[in-house]
């Protein structure tokens, strides 16, 4: 046999072996062998615990014997823990947390770039509620952010805790930041900040302890409707162009809130909508991520029933990556094989 024919034969054999190896590798993930992971980054009770535990049960059913656990924490803490190998996944990744983690800004002590990756979009449905008591609105003569910035009324403003970056930098600081206004300027007006999670803020509004609340909730939220019955509310109207200029850095949406979205929304206005991402530590194996995504997308009907925010859950929806993070290799392989990305 000539040297040329030997080279061709060798190349063909190598290609065949490579294809066989790739095929064998791909098939090795389509089994029932258990996987092990922990989910970090959310509170001990509430929405994300319910979501995580439901997803974990789906994974255990798909891969009997899997060790899928839930660890209460915080969004920033979740990113830190998946980056240092203490946990595998977090479902509460937000734009500000990711930004601060990559840049090494407090509460992160160093950049975590290269230590965690994007896995999936959890949802794109968290509405930033800008609520004000009607009594204060009438007294101060303000109904919109434009009005507030123009008149600068002293008020009691309910916002989230400093440790929750996505619900501060991604909410009230984002809205006021569209006008170049931060905490220092608000303080000069005589604005007093009352900090707490959404439920605490709603309780303060119900009790008349705050005049305005800017925090995240899904639409509609039953407690907001209930508060309005005893303490009439107004929705603080947003300026579409200013909001769009502010949300771009995080890939958030500005959408129309139609008249009647809540009983007290008297005309169409605009609101910002935030997403949460499923993130994964780079120490996690390709197999674990691939099998995790396969299990939950195969059972998408179950996931969609967990909460209205997940009603659109599908492999086509969760592949959207609004961050600067790379896809984890296991996620990249899954989405390619699922036909939702090239």
PLM regions and their residue ranges:
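Bacterial N-terminal signal peptides that target proteins for export
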Residues: 1-11
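Bacterial N-terminal signal peptides
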Residues: 9-21
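Bilobed "Venus flytrap"/periplasmic-binding protein-like clamshell domains
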Residues: 34-62, 66-72, 128-207, 301-304, ...
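Pocket-flanking alpha-helical
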Residues: 53-58, 69-112, 199-205, 213, ...
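A structural signal for short loop-to-beta-strand junctions that line the ligand-binding cleft
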Residues: 109-129, 261-270
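Periplasmic solute-binding protein
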Residues: 122-138, 271-279
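An extracytoplasmic/periplasmic, membrane-proximal ligand-sensing/linker region
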Residues: 199, 207-208, 212, 217-230, ...
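C-terminal lobe and pocket-closing loops
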Residues: 234-291, 326-327, 334, 338
């Amino acid at each position: 046999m000539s040297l040329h024919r030997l080279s061709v034969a060798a190349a063909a054999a190598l290609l065949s072996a490579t294809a066989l190896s790739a095929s064998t590798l791909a098939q090795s993930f389509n089994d029932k062998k258990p996987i092990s992971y922990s989910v970090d980054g959310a509170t001990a009770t509430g929405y994300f615990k319910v979501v995580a535990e439901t997803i974990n049960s789906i994974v255990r059913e798909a891969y009997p014997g899997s060790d899928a656990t839930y660890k209460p924490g915080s969004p920033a803490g979740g990113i830190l823990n998946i980056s240092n190998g203490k946990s595998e996944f977090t479902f509460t990744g937000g734009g500000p947390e990711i930004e601060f983690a990559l840049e090494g800004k407090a509460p992160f002590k160093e950049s975590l770039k290269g230590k965690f990756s994007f896995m999936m979009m959890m949802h794109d449905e968290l509405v930033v509620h800008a609520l004000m008591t009607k009594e204060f609105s009438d007294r101060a003569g303000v109904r919109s952010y434009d009005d507030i910035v123009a008149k600068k009324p002293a008020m009691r403003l309910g916002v989230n805790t400093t440790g929750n970056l996505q619900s501060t930098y991604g909410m009230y600081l984002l809205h006021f930041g569209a006008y170049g206004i931060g905490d220092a300027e608000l303080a000069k007006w005589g604005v007093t900040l009352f900090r707490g999670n959404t439920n605490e803020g709603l309780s303060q509004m119900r009790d008349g302890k705050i005049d305005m609340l800017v925090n995240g909730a899904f639409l509609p939220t039953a407690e907001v409707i209930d508060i309005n019955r005893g303490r009439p509310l107004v929705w603080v109207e947003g300026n579409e162009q200013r909001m769009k200029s502010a949300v771009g850095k995080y890939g958030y949406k500005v959408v129309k809130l139609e008249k009647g979205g809540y009983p007290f929304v008297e005309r169409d206005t605009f609101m910002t909508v935030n997403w949460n991402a499923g993130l994964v530590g780079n120490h996690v194996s390709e197999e674990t991520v691939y099998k995790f995504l396969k299990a939950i997308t195969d059972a998408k009907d179950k996931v969609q029933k967990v909460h209205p925010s997940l009603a659109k859950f599908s492999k086509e929806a969760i592949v959207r990556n609004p961050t600067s993070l790379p896809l984890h290799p296991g996620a990249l392989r899954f989405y390619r094989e699922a036909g939702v990305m090239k």
